[in-house]
Amino acid sequence: MSGLPLISRRRLLTAMALSPLLWQMNTAHAAAIDPNRIVALEWLPVELLLALGIVPYGVADTINYRLWVSEPPLPDSVIDVGLRTEPNLELLTEMKPSFMVWSAGYGPSPEMLARIAPGRGFNFSDGKQPLAMARKSLTEMADLLNLQSAAETHLAQYEDFIRSMKPRFVKRGARPLLLTTLIDPRHMLVFGPNSLFQEILDEYGIPNAWQGETNFWGSTAVSIDRLAAYKDVDVLCFDHDNSKDMDALMATPLWQAMPFVRAGRFQRVPAVWFYGATLSAMHFVRVLDNAIGGKA
């Protein structure tokens, strides 16, 4: 990331949900937690709450949530509590949440947050299988809130949905798929074998075109010219209200010369949160189906 321009680094850091630590805090029990007053300081626990049928009382950085995540949508009633890295502690104190949830290792220290309300961090990944960790985190949150049946129902629906969509991709063959999102007109984020999407690709027999380096979260930033090496691939690029940058890139001779562009195998698709959990994975499958489902 150090090689990116400052504006690119800022844009990428805005998108990333860093959660490398395993430290967790659990100082409240379900009986003491009002489910109508739970604040989520990061977008992973937002998704976990929504999967359990709980609308957060407050969420950090709702504007960027709607750009980068979009699904599941946030109701207008949700209060924006500031940045994910620096939430508004004064506002949080005034809101008197019954509980706060965040991504472990991201944002203010748990000790600082404990002065406002009890809370706990949840993990996005173990660096290898994000969806397996997502299911584990969902179960942990359900245990905390005494919503085990809701978690079981959601996970069963998730498995049924993933399985039901598999026939949509059986005719596709072995052409690899490159998953990307634009950071700026010169750099893209690409997603590798330890990303949220890999388990879905494996289930559907779709090879991941990116087998290069990745970070803990399953992604890496690359210069646009590195994509010229990819020839017989499909390429999907997740939008996030970045049409100006996309238009600038697509007007360049370098981009127009890309083999997958000339072959008509590049598509811009709706935003999917690549550091999410099961709801993001289901949204990804719907986006994937609209783009390449039922096609050879």
Swiss-Prot record:
Residues 37-296 form the Fe/B12 periplasmic-binding domain. The record marks 86, 88, 90, 187, 223, 226 as: Interaction with FhuB. It is found in: Periplasm. Residues 1-30 form the signal peptide. Gene3D superfamilies: Nitrogenase molybdenum iron protein domain (3.40.50.1980). It comes from the Bacteria. Keywords: Ion transport, Iron, Iron transport, Periplasm, Signal, Transport. Induction: Induced 1.3-fold by hydroxyurea. CDD domains: FhuD (cd01146). The keyword Iron applies. GO terms for cellular component: ATP-binding cassette (ABC) transporter complex, substrate-binding subunit-containing; outer membrane-bounded periplasmic space. GO terms for biological process: ferric-hydroxamate import into cell; iron ion import across plasma membrane. Exported by the Tat system. The position of the signal peptide cleavage has been experimentally proven. Can also be exported by the Sec system. Fe(III)-coprogen binds at residues 68, 84, 103, 106, 124, 217, 273-275. Belongs to the bacterial solute-binding protein 8 family. Part of the ABC transporter complex FhuCDB involved in iron(3+)-hydroxamate import. Binds the iron(3+)-hydroxamate complex and transfers it to the membrane-bound permease. Required for the transport of all iron(3+)-hydroxamate siderophores such as ferrichrome, gallichrome, desferrioxamine, coprogen, aerobactin, shizokinen, rhodotorulic acid and the antibiotic albomycin. The complex is composed of two ATP-binding proteins (FhuC), a transmembrane protein (FhuB) and a solute-binding protein (FhuD). FhuD interacts with FhuB. Substrate-loaded FhuD binds FhuB more strongly than FhuD alone. This is Iron(3+)-hydroxamate-binding protein FhuD.
